[in-house]
Amino acid sequence: MRFPSPLTEGRLVRRYKRFLADVELADGRVVTAHCANPGTMLGLIAPGRPVLLSASTNPARKLAWSWEMVQADLPGGPQWVGINTLRPNLLVAEAFREGRLPPLSGAATLRPEVRYGRASRVDFLAEGPAGPCHVEVKNCHMMREAGLAEFPDCVAARSARHMDELADVVRGGGRALLIVVVQMRAARFDVAGDIDPGFAAAFRRARAAGVETVAYACRLDPDEVTIDREIPIVTA
């Protein structure tokens, strides 16, 4: 997915109120950017870190800037990490259109935001000759061990509920798929059970029920972010 224009680099001043970040641009201006990430962003929000912002062309928007990436000092070396949790669904839709999602290779359409379960919406409903597949997408941006991407970075009760609802779909005779979009270079994925045992338990229950799970690492630069390759899920 190419950005409409190259991202603008700055340095993080502070992240606050969960969804706001002050960033100093190269010309010395300090702007407030929307931070579309409800997590703790563990290890990513130290003041002074290089960040990349996208600019909105919508004059009615309250905040003209969105925080897209941060350059993090991760185990194994520094790299750009995508923190915008609105991007993964767009990346999955793009990969589907381009035929780069093997688990959904038999689907003809991918409909977003379809109601199901206990007053929930599934991110996508894939439909085709083999029947529907409920698809949930999660963004991953945490790495505490070289090469190992982990989710979540905080207690994620809503995500745990999503896993249980996907399991209910399978128990009812349907098909369900979890796609973890890792917005950085990584070699493998695991759930962070020490941070959220509840999500880890729900993840394991869902897999045991037959929910399919797949993780994809991304390639990122100031011009583009794209799903790059599948990485193994090592959750026991």
Curated annotation (Swiss-Prot):
Pfam families in the record: SfsA, SfsA_N
Entry's Gene Ontology molecular function annotations: DNA binding
Family named by the database record: Belongs to the SfsA family.
Alphabetical list of HAMAP family matching this protein: SfsA (MF_00095)
This protein's name: Sugar fermentation stimulation protein homolog
